[in-house]
Amino acid sequence: MVCSVVVALLALLSLSGLEALQHAPKIQVYSRHPAENGKPNFLNCYVSGFHPSDIEVDLLKNGKKIEKVEHSDLSFSKDWSFYLLYYTEFTPNEKDEYACRVSHVTFSTPKTVKWDRNI
């Protein structure tokens, strides 16, 4: 009985230690297909390698939040860091700018990464 309590206590302590680890997210913004003006496509924001899991991700068009955005379930890697994919349908053109804005405890202010149509 005492042994199982000690094991449970050690397990809880090791899990609480994970919360102390903080890793900033890597942010990648790209289109599903090569960009062609006037041709529908998908804009993706892949956020990976972050810890803890609490994160806010917004896709932006000309600096304004895009409302119709979908995302994958929160998943974790072998190293216990997390990753997510946010995406939306869009039609690229010469005038509109797209970006991904991420808020995470490791950033003092939200980080915005612009979509580069040439990537």
UniProtKB/Swiss-Prot annotation:
Protein family per UniProt: Belongs to the beta-2-microglobulin family.
InterPro entries tied to this protein: B2Microglobulin (IPR015707), Ig-like_dom (IPR007110), Ig-like_dom_sf (IPR036179), Ig-like_fold (IPR013783), Ig/MHC_CS (IPR003006), Ig_C1-set (IPR003597), MHC/Immunoglobulin (IPR050160)
Subunit relationships: Heterodimer of an alpha chain and a beta chain. Beta-2-microglobulin is the beta-chain of major histocompatibility complex class I molecules.
Name by which UniProt lists this protein: Beta-2-microglobulin
Residue ranges occupied by any Ig-like C1-type domain in the UniProt entry: 25-114
Subcellular location: Secreted
Chief location bin: secreted
Disulfide bonds: 45-100
Highest taxon of the lineage: Eukaryota
BP GO annotations: antigen processing and presentation of peptide antigen via MHC class I; immune response
Gene: B2M
SUPFAM superfamilies tied to this protein: Immunoglobulin
